[in-house]
Amino acid sequence: MMTLSEHRTELIPYDLAGMDHHLTADERAVRSTVRAVCEELIDPNIGDWFERGQIDDLPGLAVELGKIGLFGMHLQGYGCAGMSAVDYGLACMELEASDSGIRSLVSVQGSLAMFAIHRWGSEEHREHWLPAMAAGTAIGCFGLTEPDVGSDPSAMKTRARRDGSDWVLDGSKMWITNGSIADVAIVWAGTEDGIRGFVVPTTTAGFSANAIRHKMSLRASVTSELILEGVRLPSTAMLPDAVGLRGPLSCLNEARYGILWGALGAGRASFQAALDYAGQRTQFGRPITGFQLTQQKLVDMSIELSKGGLLALAIGRAKDEGRLHPVQVSVGKLNNVRAALDICRTARTILGANGISLEYPVIRHMNNLESVLTYEGTSEMHTLIIGQALTGQPAFQ
């Protein structure tokens, strides 16, 4: 008869609760594939890319990510991989363990631009854009946020007006990931009939995009301002099925889902760096892992990662089974990003002065997560979304 100890599995420091046990062999294989690509193509270079604020051969990297099906991987058909929500979440976790900027490239492409076309676009839109976007040979961006409009998209100032059978767009969008490298932009604008979405090829006359400089976060990600000055589009450019805020908000929920997984990757990488460093760093004649306060920090970080992983998996399974409520995504995004940011800050204290060096991943992840906490819904907005669900009382104004 086997003893209890023979049934025990080896503990994973960042997964003490055993989320890994609840994954299928295929899901683990997806995770391993993405991790291997990140270790080969991203990890050796990411510190330098972050420091310089530029990725070497970004088009080439996009094609390599497209080869393993990362763009729109949870969408069906049109060259997309058609994988599960959990598969996609695990991929986001591995990508963000390398860098939030790389995960942003993938999630904006797949969960915002491609999802908008796949869910709300015409068949012509899907056939024209999605195969190239899935392959990474065409890049998309998503224009919703404006210089003076963030959490309240209903107040957007970008306008689309009819001119004969055409639409003419005027306005600007701000903090747009992939904007100045995009081949196509999904632009949301106010019309006489409410907010509508448009598929805008970036070669269209009157469209321009300027990269935003002097960032201290997401430096390995392209962030841009979009300018639309008399951008003339045919009537077919409109997303036919997206009327009102339902369209853009559904896209944001897709992106938030990837974020709630991805943030755990950044937290995991920072925790692992702190654990490894603490085991090697000697003070007062012993490794600092032997001190109670260090152990308390490591334990707290590990427990938060374990809880966050189980939460992400529960949300992912609900999404795959068609029973996910949007509020649950807000719960995951709020909890996991906040926890990951706290983990990075705690890990930095363990590394001491080395914690601010790009020779280690911690300060890079910490800076990145300051942005992740804000985009696709601030922590305050997600708090109010959850609060309304609990009380039935909206408190947004």
Tell me what each language-model feature is:
Residues S224-S250:
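A short, charged helix-loop
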Residues A155, T203-R232:
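Flexible, small-/acidic-enriched active-site or ligand-binding loops
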Residues G136-L144:
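A short, Trp-centered hydrophobic/proline-enriched beta-strand micro-motif
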Residues M133, D148-S151, W175-N178, G190, ...:
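Short Gly/Pro-enriched turn/cap motifs at secondary-structure boundaries
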Residues D170-A209:
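A short core secondary-structure module
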